[in-house]
Amino acid sequence: YQCDWSSDVCSSDLIQIPDTLYREEMAKQGVTLPPLGEYGVGMIFLPKEHASRLACEQELERTVRLEGQVVLGWRDVPVDVKLPMSPTVQMTEPFIRQIFIGRGRDIMTTDALERKLYVIRKTASHAIQDLHLKHGKEYFVASMSARTIVYKGLLLANQVGAYYQDLQDPRTVSALALVHQRFSTNTFPAWELAHPYRMIAHNGEINRSEEHTS
């Protein structure tokens, strides 16, 4: 038996939205982003299978519009496809895109936009699973926020910056970085299970409140 150690580690970075990078990259598509704090970015793990991916994207866009917000556009997240990975990691590697969401007329503050993005994320995720797509389970939102963005995966800590080319770009500037690496001991690792999640990082030992009061 040979241990595939490279598929037992999940790593990630949570940083502030790199506004300059995103603004300049979206401008190449003819998209002018609103001021920082008036748009949100979703980091979306999508199925590689085209039909399922398209259905996921369309359902997410539908939810954004139903919630009164604006779909500004999509961006393919540049990754190093030549980065050495084990077959297990490559087999589960998602297609990664970002959706840019502008605030609607009913949203007056960044806090209100954050709450609306939460509703969009949860509503769309449930709606997509209700479609019973062949690869619908591969849809996952790593983050959706007007303040922060999460770059994560089934990667070693020293691979995150190499895999996600945005993290090598000098336009990526952040006053904070929440970095995490976890060796999986009691759960099977996966791209979507890498920490940090959208607000925190932990080692999987958050137990029920009853365990702390009994």
Q: What is the role of each PLM region?
A:
Residues 1-2:
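N-terminal-proximal low-complexity accessory segments that begin disordered
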Residues 6, 171-174, 193-196, 200-203:
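Short, well-ordered loop/turn elements at secondary-structure boundaries
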Residues 6-11, 212:
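Short, small-residue-biased leader/transition segments that mark boundaries at the very start
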Residues 12-16, 198-199:
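Short beta-strand scaffold segments in enzyme catalytic cores
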Residues 14-175, 179-181, 185, 214:
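Extended, highly charged
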Residues 178, 200-209:
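Extended, hydrophobic alpha-helical segments in both membrane/secreted and soluble proteins
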Residues 183-193:
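Flexible, glycine/threonine-enriched loop-and-boundary segments that flank and lead into catalytic domains
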Residues 187, 209-210:
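Active-site-proximal flexible loops/turns
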